[in-house]
Amino acid sequence: MKVNSINTLAKASVCAALLTLVACADQTAKSTGAKELAAIWPKLDIAVKTDPKVEQRITNIMQDMSLEQKVAQVIQPEIRDITVEDMRRYGFGSYLNGGGSFPQGNKHATPGDWIALAESMYQASVDNSMDGSTIPTMWGTDAVHGHNNVIGATLFPHNIALGATHNPELIKQIARVTAKEVLATGIDWIFAPTVATVRDDRWGRTYEGYSEDPEIVGQYAAAIVEGLQGTPEDNFLGEGRVIATVKHFLGDGGTVGGDDQGDNINDEQSLFDIHAQGYVGGLTAGAQTVMASFNSWHGDKLHGNKYLLTSVLKDRMGFDGLVVGDWNGHGQVAGCSNESCPQSINAGLDIFMVPTGAWKPLMENTINQVKSGVIPQSRLDDAVSRILRVKIRAGLLDNPSPENRALAGKKDIIGAPEHRAIARQAVRESLVLLKNAKQLLPLDPSLNVLVAGGGADNIGQQSGGWTITWQGTGNENQDFPGATSIYAGIEKVVTAAGGTATLSPSGTYQAKPDVAIVIFGEQPYAEGNGDIANLEYQRGKKTDLALLRSLQNKGIAVVSVFLSGRPLWVNPELNASDAFIAAWLPGTEGGGIADVIFSQQDGEIKHDFTGKLSFSWPKSPNQTNVNRYDKDYMPLFPYGFGLQYGETSTLGNDLSEDSDNGKQQALMALALFDRSVQAPWKMALSEQGNTVPINASVVSAKSLQFRTIDRRVQEDAFQLQWQQSTSGQWRIYNDFPEDLRAFSEADGVLTFDYLLNNTPAAAVWLQMSCMDECPSDLDISEHLKVDATQDWQSLTVALSCFTDKGADLSQVISPISIRTSGNLNLTLSDISIRPDTANGNLITCD
């Protein structure tokens, strides 16, 4: 079934097909009082009805629960921060694994390893020997484009691509597959779907949204919830089903400037019309959980917004499931910390998501706050009753333990061929053809084809963020058994037809090809880290454009396959391409691209382009929030655009290439670690000749350990722990040299923030390395200071310190490394090379 685009989107309320289930909002409501609440926010006809037997069971369970047992139900720690014995002692109501968190910290954990951890936690939770409780816990995970934390899983195109398919039935199939693969690892609950209506494409989570059109978001939300959970008429939360979460409530796609965790200043009518339609769809379909958002609404953090969480969501819309927080999001509420936040639970939060060691003081403080009356007993009881309601509906109080469930440990489910076939279909249907000069496509598969670009044979790049690791970084093709890179898909089709497919990321060749297919685009990122200042692609250093132009100048026809998590300003790249495809982030089944761009051997079309833009495409870098039905709507490609074979492409090679950025082209800071290591840089530990890539949140190399921590937001810093190592080293590096001479000419500096927990026991060496041997060690021991208040400090080193010692900045392969041979506990954040700022604790080496 295909979705027909709506003809109009009234500024007031979307009263389309989806909203026939509810009363459409009063168009004239302006304020937020009680009457206006009733007018703006609908009472939903939710598919899952109240069951008196379930309610009586909740009452029976709760009458025997102690205060401590009740509070344990509202605490959700992370697997890196608790042990099985902690679960046995406290009986947490739920727990999670964050992105990049695995059983035993092993990125390559098998389905059996996941099942073993699930079983251990389950058995500990029902063991009443220490906490007196037998209520089973439940495990939540971010399975946002398939079971994306697990090696070998089927990874689907990200939501922005699925929006281009305009096919909610396909979305439902994807949800069913995801549920099965998640259940095969013993997990009960997934934190999906994201139902943000994205209005500013600078937001780093744009690719998690299906569309800028709220109607599409609402329809998709209903489809994916039904696929994950089933329906009351079709095996609701039965075998093969998981608990769904609609997130993030509310308005995360509409913050000022596209700022992640920023402020949404829409009026209340727009908040409903634009940003609430995913909840209308998802909750009506019976979603059992809602995740509160990091963002604010008019300055008030959603984790503490009682009006929206309780008055709107629970009381008016009729949601009777549970509201879970996001990663220590409660700590951002005014007057709160990660360790204490009665404001959040009083506002309507039912579960604190509390990674890090903050879970223990939070639990203790919450118990004391209930005892003192700061948190009313009735509010705690309501939260616990909601948690139990979800568990009972999901069968968790009656089902066998994780290792004894129907799909548990079935390895053949993970990445099953029939699952990959659905993912490949999704890739085909999501591709949007933006340009096809002289009907270059489809290509004859018997040609001599050059396959170029950094994304050609890079499954990690084509899969994007939230892929094995949180940011999607640190992955290699071998981390994706059973997957197909875009090049591999092309090579298979071309070889079968008697043609030749040559992989050359740099675009070099021996025999001139008939055509070049260049796969390029954004490097993986996730929330926060993906926020950008404007929509210009490869702002500053346009290496991909240089590749396209070099091929075009040699008379080679160029097909561009653009990998991105959002529409970007690519006018120069469009001009340098004969055909241009928006491929989004297709996931593990790269063969879907070859399915469409090549004809059959007899010249007949095998699969046509059917994808249509669900996001408007900008005509300038600063057209950051161009959306359908906007006043003066003038994108480069409008919502719904997408060519098919045989249609005339009117786009020439004369698009304006004026970036309109003016002085913004000046030398900018080079971020090395900004909430995560920045592509193309990578991190590694080494000791005694043993090098260990940092591709997970906890990594060890003999006596040197790396662990991500939270400074301001999730995993935006990391701790290095040396234990009398034999010169253990941490470094940021690249496989290819980078020319950093422009920074030296600008009196540049290397700078980072740090926390030091102990005085260095031995010399601490800071080094910058280049392609050829270039010794540049600096002993920074005396500059690292232990701060008694544990405040962050900055250390800034002039680049001249390195060049004076012989560093060649024209060929830098490691811009920073730190090594020592003594005990040291050092935490780092915000690492960059920048023009001289004359700030911080500057080391000049004069």
What label would you give each PLM region?
Residues G93, L447, G748-L750, S814, ...:
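Residue-level detector of short, conserved catalytic/binding motifs and their immediate flanks
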Residues S700-R731:
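Short carbohydrate-recognition loop motifs
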Residues C24-V692, D846:
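Glycoside hydrolase catalytic-domain context in secreted enzymes
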Residues D808-P815:
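Short, surface-exposed ligand- or partner-binding patches at beta-edge/loop junctions that are enriched
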Residues K2-D26:
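Gram-negative bacterial Sec-dependent N-terminal signal peptides
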Residues S725-A807, S821-T827, S832-N839:
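Extracellular ligand-binding interfaces
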Residues I387, L450, I597, L750-Y754, ...:
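Buried hydrophobic-core signal for structured, non-transmembrane domains
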